Amino acid sequence: MSMSDPLGDMLTRIRNALARKKGKLVTPASKLRACVLDVLQSEGYIRGYNQVDLGDGKSEIEIELKYFEGLAAIRELSRVSKPGRRVYVSAKSLPQVANGLGVSILSTPKGIMADHEAREQNVGGELLCRVF
């Protein structure tokens, strides 16, 4: 069975693992997922991730979630641009998440990056998800 929204699947797996207070989770690997996880790690929302090769050209990503005093570092994680409805924003119209406390993740011509990096580089793109 093919998956229509691999990034949405990963975000849902993270939300479900956080709801169950899991320390780690596993998801199929892709370049897009790895780039989004790089941004989440650099912004301090996850401890880290490790790509595991399963052989046969397949690999998985093991994500280590972050908690502080029993509370998850991620309070809200939502997909914005979906396969049926893409959402594009310019550098000037980038929305702030939770008054600047959260972060939006964008796919730009210069790569996957957080909203504050896109503002600094004056570049817009597809608004993938919001994290708070």
From Swiss-Prot:
InterPro entries: Ribosomal_uS8 (IPR000630), Ribosomal_uS8_CS (IPR047863), Ribosomal_uS8_sf (IPR035987). The keyword Signal does not apply. It comes from the Bacteria. One of its GO terms (biological process) is translation. Coiled coil: none annotated. Keywords: Ribonucleoprotein, Ribosomal protein, RNA-binding, rRNA-binding. One of its GO terms (molecular function) is structural constituent of ribosome. It holds the Pfam family Ribosomal_S8. GO terms for cellular component: ribonucleoprotein complex; ribosome. Part of the 30S ribosomal subunit. Contacts proteins S5 and S12. Belongs to the universal ribosomal protein uS8 family. One of the primary rRNA binding proteins, it binds directly to 16S rRNA central domain where it helps coordinate assembly of the platform of the 30S subunit. This is Small ribosomal subunit protein uS8. It comes from Bartonella quintana (strain Toulouse) (Rochalimaea quintana).
